A protein has these predicted regions:
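Conserved "HGTGT" condensation-loop signature of ketosynthase/thiolase-family condensing enzymes
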Residues: 1-95, 99-101, 107-108, 115-185
Length: 185
């Protein structure tokens, strides 16, 4: 197992998500030319959309929809955690984001009684990784890995973002969602 932090990052104790993502968020805000207030309004609206979805999910950690204003407003119960993120823009420590995709042959799908109109066929898959060490990245507001992997997947499938009905992008922190959306077009 290789430590994901460079020795310089270890020396200054940099490496936890609550340290890295706020740095990226601030870099993205700067690269976007937004004021702190305008950026907070933007990311709290983004998070309010996720909150709306979570409110209808019986397995969600927080099942009460929060408005953008509630999300960005600091209070006794919604303390600042790591600028620019108040409590409701932070991940919860007991969240399981595990996912699985089980692929079977048509023969197996038939044997399992899965209706043919429920079958899906993967067209392509790609993988990429941004620089292993955070401090060695070219910048903190983009992801060449997402751009390259997403672009290659579109190329392999002959698709464009315009002819895709839905792309599900989620992360524990707003910046990762914003960067992914920008990189995927």
């Amino acid at each position: 197992d290789k430590d994901m932090r460079h020795e310089a990052e270890i020396a200054v104790r940099l490496g936890r998500p609550i340290q890295i993502y706020p740095i990226m968020e601030t870099a993205l805000r700067h690269a976007s030319g937004l004021s702190v207030d305008a950026h907070m309004e933007h990311i709290s609206k983004l998070w309010a959309g996720f909150s709306d979805v979570a409110a209808s999910n019986p397995n969600a950690w927080i099942r009460e929809a929060k408005s953008a204003e509630e999300i960005r407003t600091i209070s006794d119960s919604k303390r600042p955690v790591s600028f620019p993120y108040p409590k409701l823009m932070n991940s919860n420590n007991n969240v399981d984001q595990a996912a699985a995709l089980i692929l079977v042959s048509e023969e197996k799908a038939k044997a399992l009684g899965i209706a043919k109109d429920k079958w899906i066929y993967p067209w392509a898959g790609t993988d990429a990784q941004d620089h292993y060490y955070f401090s060695n990245r070219d910048n903190f507001h983009s992801s060449p890995a997402i751009r390259l992997a997403g672009g290659k997947c579109l190329e392999l499938t002959g698709s464009t973002p315009d002819n895709i009905d839905m792309i599900d992008v989620y992360s524990c922190f707003p910046v990762a969602v914003q960067i992914a959306c920008r990189e995927l077009g």
